[in-house]
Amino acid sequence: GSPNSSENGGVDSVDYVTIASTGNAKDFGDLFLNSMTAGAGANPVRAVVANGKDGPAHSNVIFKVNIATLGDSSDFGDQNVSRQTHGACSNSVRMVFGGGGTPTKISSIETLLLASGGNSVPFGDLGAAKSSLGACCDATRAVFGAGIFHPETHTNNLEYINIATGGDTVDFGDLLDNSKTQGGTGFSNGH
């Protein structure tokens, strides 16, 4: 994450909360690089972070942590394309991330298998190049929404892919308004 929107390099901390109880977040460990504008996914065993930026530079590093054990991250692999402000989500098998900036806005979608380490691979394309988009998944479908086209035009478009097979996105409808910077999008580990 990043403590603010400046180019200060982000932070390397990982925190967690216990969903079954109330209370403040606690320290889980550290990423091995500072990170900001990253995307994340998880299955019941492993959480994975596809890095966005490390200071002013874009980073293609993918981190992993084992959910059951507190501790620092380790290397999972590399993104095919270094990107920031991308939409990312996962089901219990696969993580997908799409769009983002390099800093030029891009449309490509990549995937990785959560159970095994390794580099991400191409998996399809969004309908248009955009950054600052959100994503969410269930066991079958990954939905990407909102974002910013070039030049700084916001969109309310929703589009999806079949998470098992990939491919180019299909229109899924529209949000009620044009939105950007969909930080805080998430996923459920209940699938």
Predicted regions and their residues:
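Polar, enzyme-active/binding microenvironments
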Residues: G1-H191
